[in-house]
């Protein structure tokens, strides 16, 4: 959400820190917070003024009218404060319908003053600007300030000066206080703007001869401005409204939400409740809550929440397990219900999100059965059939009753089923599979005739006169038609999937040319990106600079802005500098409201229509679609969005607009145009902007509006009907009717979905619309029926003549999507069995990386997983690590190190120098480790005794690999071998091959003392013993690892550490190019050549 309430303490702290005014503000930072855990001795140490001044104490928990409720203790000593707090601190209180515990109080100095010194000041944001209210009589009895107070609107980008304040606001203020008040209000307004407040009320503001005192303060800030105000705000806290506790689970989901590009929301209403929801989509989540409350479930509704914006499988798992954990804590005598609902997704892969939920259900199957939980599922969107299949499957395998429905079932029908108001069908009708839409069912390869590109009703627009003649449209700068079959757009952002979706839509609508002319992406140079137009490959240019894109594509008049919330404002402002652009869609959610208002102001000046922010966009069947609107091609075809119908709609929610596509296609001849204006408080274009366009468009015969709690935009529709400006039938339903039934305020998924006054509630708006003559259903459940009855009435009157359906062209399916749907298979070019990086976390041979660290497996354990695909015993891991340590380096003289040093001194980079050293490893250097293992294993396994083996090798004239050392001998042992031998003898369960090799060593050293078992030989034979005897491998597996050269890997990996060390050493010593000295080279030339 956007506007969030902050505590009085936070508001005052920010104000005292950052307000800039000539008025003398008294008692700065003089406040002390008291909670049930407060240590009074410590509090007095921090705030010594508590002992010397008269005090005021009050709860700081977003409670309005505390004075009237007797929740303010005035003019008390410290002991008096303690006595006053005793029956209140930590005790339950009732405020209106809300019950909650009082556990956060504020103590401040008492300010003696007269009633004449109390004033009221309030600043709040609206679409047009910020209203400043002032009343010369403040305090608890201020009454209806809207009616009494002086009011001044400060427009967007305008400044408030002291002269305006005196002239418009301080009309009735005492003359001697006007200067002080004007300076304070001016500073307060600048502070309010700079720190992105949306509401700031001080009542009373006391002005005495000593200065200004801020007694009581209430405030809201725009939480989305955190990235701008972080330095000044610090770690700001947003307390829950009174009557609702702050739960750690809510904080956990809020933290997940903050770290994700997706949206994840959770509000606990009644943790003991029977009905729980897990709904996809900001709009759909409100509709489900409405329906539950309408059907009598308000007291049993446990939570409000939503997930949207394509969360990953892991994020959905984390969200789902949080809800399942909460709902399986307390039993309910009637069992519990979980509603996993959602509208038809535009771009979220339903199967991926459902797999996360399925994982959570499997993890909690025991508690779910114990608590007698029944689950109802309804969803649509990309790959929804697979999602529903896995959901149904988990019900069968776990024994949990799970009822699964798709787009063939009305979105909220499952609520009626869950609450026993409608029967649960045994076999719901199944929708056609994705593939059935995209693959030509007849088998014919010919492209069908072009589909119709105008509704039949549009071609007869002049023949059938409307029932009433509409008043002429007011002259406007903005066009009634935003999109046509020839509309061209630029897409800001590297959104290849959305662009391909637009091109597929264009193709299936039989457009002559693609609707995307170019893309703008500032983070790469100019280039071309490959896309498909039907089965053909085409190139679309990508520009670094917007100016270049505009210059080269003057035919473009639409920009689709996929910039992030941080970049969306600047990129949209830049776009509006180009007169050719008439429509801009802003997809990003979370743009601060103050910045959105600046965009709206500039757009109005330029005559530009903005759709969004926080939207999926809009669609005009047969002509143009914005980004991901309408979902994937299967939904476009199922909802008949490839040709126009007669019904135009406007909604706030992107997901609900897709649901409207589905409802309208099932109950009428289809959609003519649909726009989702976005969920923010100040959408760029309003309901009425689009409703008036539809009124002036001959092809539109009826209008559907899906309104929402918050704002007053829907009342303009009532006014339009009364004034005769709107004459076409309008069907409207405002979602959010459940809000009036909750005891405490709930912020819904959309930033603008919050009623600040009675007229903004969904119930009030639905009533007013009905009285104005709009067709209003009794609930969202009946919306489809009302639309159908209005449509059938228009058909009966002849205003709409349904046209004959023409099949659309067949569009080839993307390979990657066909594979995801399981429609095709192809042999993979590569196979791997050791590592998987595709999920939420890295997996080594089946073990998540978090487990690797939790178990403290170390380098040896990781090698066990990556090299041998299994967990090795601890001593084996330690042995591997010891081998790496002892093989790490053997000085600069050996061939590998020598090569590395020469390369480093020749100025080569790290990788080149390292590889030059590694390339020397072979039979003569390092490779003895592998060869020794094979040679000793063969001898031992053949059953010949050590003496026989030595004699055999001597007779064949072969060296025994792993025996012998240039420097070390039986009298000067190699300490590396000694360390390894001690460890192996102490920890290995058996060492038959090592014992054999040591017997061989006795024979060889009796002939020559330096023919010892060297470090290569020791590691080789000991490693074979480890593989054969640790219990983790079969004999065949152990032999295979020796045969494929796994042991050489130990030397290569270990020695790489030393080679890198030599490289860094040479660079650090700044050694120059190496040239070998002549006196160390013996020049032996052929004699006949030297003559």
From Swiss-Prot:
What cellular-component terms does GO give this entry? Answer: cytosol; mitochondrion
Q: How is its activity regulated?
A: Phosphorylation results in activation of its activity. Glucose 6-phosphate, fructose 6-phosphate, fructose 2,6-bisphosphate, ribulose 5-phosphate, and fructose 1,6-bisphosphate also act as activators.
Name used for this protein in its record: ATP-citrate synthase
Q: What CDD domains has UniProt attached to this entry?
A: CCL_ACL-C
Q: Where is the ATP-grasp domain?
A: 4-265
What's in the keyword line of the UniProt record?
Acetylation, ATP-binding, Cytoplasm, Isopeptide bond, Lipid biosynthesis, Lipid metabolism, Magnesium, Metal-binding, Nucleotide-binding, Phosphoprotein, Transferase, Ubl conjugation
> What's the Enzyme Commission number for this chain?
2.3.3.8
Annotated crosslink Glycyl lysine isopeptide (Lys-Gly) (interchain with G-Cter in ubiquitin) location? 530, 536, 544
Major place of localization?
A: cytoplasm
> What is this organism's lineage?
Eukaryota, Metazoa, Chordata, Craniata, Vertebrata
Phosphothreonine found at: 447, 629
Which coenzymes or cofactors are required?
A: Mg(2+)
> In which organism is this protein found?
Mus musculus
Where is the protein found, in the record's own terms? Answer: Cytoplasm, Cytosol
In this chain, the stretch annotated as Disordered covers 442-478
Function text: Catalyzes the cleavage of citrate into oxaloacetate and acetyl-CoA, the latter serving as common substrate in multiple biochemical reactions in protein, carbohydrate and lipid metabolism.
């Amino acid at each position: 959400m956007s506007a969030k309430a902050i505590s009085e303490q936070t508001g005052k702290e920010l104000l005292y820190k950052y307000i800039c005014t000539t008025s003398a503000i008294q008692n700065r930072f003089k406040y002390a917070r008291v909670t049930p855990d407060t240590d009074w001795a410590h509090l007095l140490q921090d705030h010594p003024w508590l002992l010397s001044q008269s005090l005021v104490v009050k709860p700081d928990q977003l409670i309005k009218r505390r004075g009237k409720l007797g929740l303010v203790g005035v003019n008390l000593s410290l002991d008096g404060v303690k006595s006053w707090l005793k029956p209140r601190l930590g005790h339950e209180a009732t405020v209106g319908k809300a019950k909650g515990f009082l556990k956060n109080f504020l103590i401040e100095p008492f300010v003696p003053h007269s009633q004449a010194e109390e004033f009221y000041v309030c600043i709040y944001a609206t679409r047009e600007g910020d209203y400043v209210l002032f009343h010369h009589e403040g305090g608890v009895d201020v009454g209806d300030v809207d009616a009494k107070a002086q009011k001044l609107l400060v427009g967007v980008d305008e400044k408030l000066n002291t002269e305006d304040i005196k002239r418009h606001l301080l009309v009735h203020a005492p003359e001697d206080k006007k200067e002080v008040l004007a300076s304070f209000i001016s500073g307060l307004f600048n502070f309010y703007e700079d720190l992105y407040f949306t509401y700031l009320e001080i009542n009373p503001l006391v002005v005495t001869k000593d200065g200004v005192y801020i007694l009581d303060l209430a405030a809201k800030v725009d939480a989305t401005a955190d990235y701008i105000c972080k330095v000044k705000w610090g770690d700001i806290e947003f307390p829950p409204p009174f009557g609702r506790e702050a739960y750690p689970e809510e904080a956990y989901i809020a933290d997940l939400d903050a770290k994700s590009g997706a949206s994840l929301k959770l509000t606990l209403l009644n943790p003991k409740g029977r009905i729980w929801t897990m709904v996809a989509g900001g709009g759909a989540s409100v509709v489900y809550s409405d329906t539950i409350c309408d059907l009598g479930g308000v007291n049993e509704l446990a939570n409000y929440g939503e997930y949207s914006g394509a969360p990953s499988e892991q994020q959905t798992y984390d969200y789902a397990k949080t809800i399942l954990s909460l709902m399986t804590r307390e039993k309910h005598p009637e069992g519990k219900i979980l509603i996993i609902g959602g509208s038809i997704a535009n771009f979220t892969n339903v199967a991926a999100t459902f797999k996360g939920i399925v994982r959570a259900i499997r993890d909690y199957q025991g508690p779910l059965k114990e608590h007698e939980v029944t689950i109802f599922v309804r969803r649509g969107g990309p790959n929804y059939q697979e999602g529903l299949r896995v959901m149904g499957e988990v019900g069968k395998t776990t024994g949990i009753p799970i009822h699964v429905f798709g787009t063939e079932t009305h979105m909220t029908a499952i609520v009626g089923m869950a609450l026993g108001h409608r029967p649960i069908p045994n076999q719901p009708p199944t929708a056609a599979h994705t593939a059935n839409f995209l693959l030509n069912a007849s088998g014919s390869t010919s492209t069908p005739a072009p589909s119709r590109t105008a509704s039949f009703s549009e071609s007869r627009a002049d023949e059938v006169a409307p029932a009433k003649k509409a008043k002429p449209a007011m002259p406007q700068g903005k066009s009634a038609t935003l999109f046509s079959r020839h509309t061209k757009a630029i897409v800001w952002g590297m959104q290849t999937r959305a662009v391909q979706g637009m091109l597929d839509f264009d193709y299936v609508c039989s457009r002559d040319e693609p609707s995307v002319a170019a893309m703008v992406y500032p983070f790469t140079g100019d280039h071309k990106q490959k896309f498909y137009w039907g089965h053909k490959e085409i190139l679309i240019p990508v520009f670094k600079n917007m100016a270049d894109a505009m210059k080269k594509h003057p035919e473009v008049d639409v920009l689709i802005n996929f910039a992030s919330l941080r970049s969306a404002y600047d990129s949209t402002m830049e776009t509006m500098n180009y007169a050719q652009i008439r429509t801009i869609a802003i997809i990003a959610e979370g743009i601060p409201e103050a910045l959105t208002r600046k965009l709206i102001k500039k757009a109005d000046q330029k005559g530009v229509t903005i759709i969004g922010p926080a939207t999926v966009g809009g669609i005009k069947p047969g002509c143009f679609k914005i980004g991901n609107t309408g979902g994937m091609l299967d939904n476009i075809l199922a909802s008949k969005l490839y040709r126009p119908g007669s019904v135009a709609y406007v909604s706030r929610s992107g997901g609900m607009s897709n649901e409207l596509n589905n409802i309208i296609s099932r109950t009428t001849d289809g959609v003519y145009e649909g726009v989702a204006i976005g969920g923010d408080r100040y959408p760029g274009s309003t309901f009425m902007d689009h409703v008036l366009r539809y009124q002036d468009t001959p092809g539109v015969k009826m209008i559907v509006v899906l309104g929402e709690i918050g704002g007053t935009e829907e009342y303009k529709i009532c006014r339009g009907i009364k004034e005769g400006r709107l004459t076409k039938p309008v069907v409207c339903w405002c979602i959010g009717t459940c809000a009036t039934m909750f005891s405490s305020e709930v912020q819904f998924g959309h930033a603008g979905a919050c009623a600040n006054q009675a007229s903004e509630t969904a119930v009030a708006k639905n009533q007013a619309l009905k009285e104005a003559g709009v067709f209003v259903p009794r609930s969202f459940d009946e919306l489809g029926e009302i639309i159908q009855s209005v449509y059938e009435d228009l058909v009966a009157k002849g205003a709409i003549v349904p046209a004959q359906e023409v099949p659309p062209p067949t569009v080839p399916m993307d390979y990657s999507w066909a594979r995801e749907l399981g429609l095709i298979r192809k042999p993979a070019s590569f196979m791997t069995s050791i590592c998987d990086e595709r999920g939420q976390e890295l997996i080594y041979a089946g073990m998540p990386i978090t487990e690797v660290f939790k178990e403290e497996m170390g380098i040896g354990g990781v090698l066990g997983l990556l090299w041998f695909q299994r967990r090795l015993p601890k001593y084996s891991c330690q042995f591997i690590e010891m081998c790496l340590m002892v093989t790490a380096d053997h000085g600069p003289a050996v061939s590998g190190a020598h090569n590395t040093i020469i390369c480093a001194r020749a100025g080569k980079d790290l990788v080149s120098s390292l590889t030059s050293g590694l390339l020397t490893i072979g039979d003569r250097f390092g490779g003895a480790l592998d060869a020794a293992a094979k040679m000793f294993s063969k001898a031992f396994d053949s059953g010949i005794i050590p003496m026989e083996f030595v004699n055999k090798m001597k007779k064949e004239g072969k060296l025994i690999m792993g025996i012998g050392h240039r420097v070390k001998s039986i009298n000067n042992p190699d300490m590396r071998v000694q360390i390894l031998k001690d460890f192996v003898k102490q920890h290995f369960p058996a060492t038959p091959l090592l014992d054999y090799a040591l017997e061989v060593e006795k024979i060889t050293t009796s002939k020559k003392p330096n023919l010892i078992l060297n470090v290569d030989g020791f590691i080789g034979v000991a490693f074979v013993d480890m593989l054969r005897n640790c219990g983790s491998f079969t004999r065949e597996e152990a032999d295979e690892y020796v045969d494929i050269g796994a042991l050489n890997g130990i030397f290569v990996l270990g020695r790489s550490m030393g080679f890198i060390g030599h490289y860094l050493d040479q660079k650090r010593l700044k050694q120059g190019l190496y040239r070998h000295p002549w006196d160390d080279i013996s020049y032996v030339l052929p004699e006949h050549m030297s003559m």
